[in-house]
Amino acid sequence: MQITITREYHLDKLSARFPFLEYLPEELRRHSGRIFNRDERTTEDYQILFIGKSGYGKSSTINALTGHNAMQTSDIEACTKDAFTVEYSLNAQKTRYLSFCDLPGIAESEKTDNEYLALYENMLYHCFCIVYVLRADMRDYTRDLALFREKLSPYRARIVIAINCADKAEPTSRESTDLTGEQIDNLERKRSSVSQIFHMPKEQVIYYSARERINLDALMHQIYNRMTI
């Protein structure tokens, strides 16, 4: 699978948004990243893979976390056919990188899942975190559960289940984008339900909204925790 780098920055850009990330380079020194050939030089990449169905907000989640519209987004069709990344150098020599990687939509059908997963099986093995994106207003997890059982079970310790579109949780309001107490209660129940259904610790299930920039700090913090276990 082709990997296209859409943007490249220094980690300072990201740690300005999430100050706890300034400790990440030191935390990752005890780990070897994925070897990547970049512009006739070899680097170590510490990849965060964003996985989920098309249209559930993988690309917009990366845009929201990084603060850059680096990934093409669409509510009605799949934009990602190959792997696209936003990269952050972890040292002045630019030999180590933190990589936010947007992968093609999966959990669509068994045939397409097998095709895509075969292409990036090596990426799953070497990545440092998998962000599996769901939606707060979805109820059918049949394909997602099948995918977890068949392909993702070995990586559970590195997975964050990210429930996007928290602002769509009932009861919705047109008067404010802030979550109401009732919405938060329903989202907490959603977290508990998803945790039980997928047999994942509740701390690894986070609700947020990429569009409204809700709870992004909690999502990024859990990604950090999964990368540094």
Task: Describe each PLM feature range.
Residues A169-I229:
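Canonical P-loop GTPase G-domain recognition
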Residues Q2-S99:
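Conserved G1/Walker A P-loop phosphate-binding module
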Residues G105-D113, S176-E182:
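Flexible beta-alpha connector loops of hexameric P-loop NTPases
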Residues Y155-I159, E203:
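A short helix->loop->beta-strand "cap" motif at the edges of active sites that frequently abuts
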Residues T112-M138, E150-Y155:
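Inter-motif core of Ras-like GTPase G domains
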Residues G105-A107, D137-R139, C165-A169, R211-I214:
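Conserved nucleotide-binding/hydrolysis micro-motifs of P-loop NTPases
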Residues F50, Y132, I161-I163:
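Structural beta-sheet core signal
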